[in-house]
A protein has these predicted regions:
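Bacterial N-terminal signal peptides that target proteins for export
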Residues: 1-11
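Coiled-coil-like amphipathic alpha-helices with heptad-repeat character
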Residues: 3, 14, 370-372
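Enriched but not universal
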Residues: 22-28, 362-378
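Glycan-processing catalytic domains of CAZymes
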Residues: 28-364
């Protein structure tokens, strides 16, 4: 065999080996453009923050860590903050972020929210620069909504054509736009990922039966969120709120959160999920790592401070008037505040997933028992 043929052969064998590794792990053999590990890690990302306390800040009593070491509010398109986030995401070895543009941001379905997609696109521009000069690549994808069909707050959303039209906008404004790099968009089997938030259990069937054109949507790998009813996650969904059953095992994607909407009154329903001093997050990761790994682990969320699901470092010591209260303080079992407890755990547990490192200890908790978690891929 000549050297050139040997090289071609080895290049051909590697994708097959990677695919077989995923099959042995129980993962779906889908192909992605992540960083090459058998399991990719994605995380929801919110850009819906405006300068001087605008945007969705009035609803949030969380104040995230800023590049200068202080805690406070920031603009979703602030270059220094975006670059800081990208640095931390890369250090954590997260493969892609999923933009929350579910509130009619594209095609003007929610005119009051159009500004949010512009903030998201500002992050895309910084990712283009980041990926040019860093070995760990950060990809991105977009989440849109079809939940608003028939909602009087979204008068132009009248049918499942909303998916086609938002897909067209994402393609034209981002994926095919030369201001960005198509290689930076997270892809599944060669198609850019587009997640659709819908609260109907039969959302997939409704979309499949929609009679209008789907030329733009067919260019995407369409996936779903919230289809267990009432926005809770079903098996194979990429979000939204966790089902009461906890992590739902699935070969393609498994979704987990540290908590969700814990400002709501106890007993308010599925959306009220307490963090329990970090135990809820730890237990969710234990379930993922104790079973054959999926192709994608999806975390909700990096910085969703309005629905109480963030893991990025934040100060939770103050209740700001007129925000969504009460929030659940980020305390360990030692009853001390630990602003970075969820981010530190996220970084550590991804090392366990990828490299078999010992499980991290949640801040303020007793040491984890045993050594490395049970990893079911080679």
């Amino acid at each position: 065999m000549t050297l050139s043929k040997a090289i071609k052969f080895s290049l051909g064998v590697f994708p097959i080996f990677l695919q077989l590794s995923c099959i042995e792990a129980g993962a779906s053999p889908i192909k992605t453009n992540g960083n090459g590990d058998p399991t990719d890690v994605g995380i929801w990302y919110c850009a819906n923050w405006d300068a001087n306390g605008g945007g969705w800040w009035p609803m949030a009593s969380y104040r995230p860590l800023l590049p200068d070491g202080s805690y406070g509010m920031h603009d979703g398109s602030d270059v220094a903050v975006i670059d800081f986030h990208l640095q931390k995401l890369a250090e954590a070895q997260i493969d892609f972020i999923l933009f929350d543009d579910t509130n009619g941001d594209f095609n003007g379905y929610g005119p009051q929210n159009v500004w949010i997609k512009e903030k998201s696109k500002a992050v895309c521009a910084r990712i283009k620069l980041w990926n040019r000069s860093h070995s760990w690549k950060i990809k991105y994808a977009f989440a849109i909504g079809s939940f608003m069909i028939g909602d009087r707050e979204y008068p132009t959303a009248t049918s499942y054509d909303v998916i086609e039209q938002q897909a067209r906008c994402v393609a034209q404004e981002v994926f095919l736009n030369s201001d960005y790099d198509t290689n930076d968009y997270y892809q599944i089997d060669g198609k850019p990922l587009l997640v659709v938030l819908d609260y109907n259990k039969d959302a997939r069937t409704r979309w499949a039966n929609h009679p209008s054109g789907k030329a733009w949507a067919n260019r995407f790998a369409i996936r779903w969120a919230g289809t267990s009813g009432g926005y809770s996650v079903a098996a194979g969904d990429y979000g939204w709120a966790m089902n009461a059953a906890g992590v739902l095992l699935h070969p393609e994607v498994e979704y987990l959160q540290p908590g969700h909407d814990n400002h709501l009154p106890a007993g308010a329903g599925w959306m009220h999920t307490l963090r329990k001093n970090g135990d809820y997050y730890v237990n969710n990761w234990d379930r993922i790592l104790g079973n054959p790994l999926p192709r994608i682990v999806m975390i909700g969320a990096f910085n969703d401070y309005t629905e109480d699901s963030a893991v990025w470092t934040a100060d939770t010591s103050v209740d700001y008037p007129k925000s969504r209260l009460p929030i659940e303080r980020w305390q360990g079992h030692d009853v001390q505040l630990h602003p970075s407890m969820y981010w530190d755990y996220t970084v550590g547990i991804i090392r366990t997933l990828r490299h078999g490192a010992p499980k991290p200890i949640m801040a303020g908790s007793a040491p984890a028992s045993g050594g490395a978690a049970d990893r079911r891929h080679p």
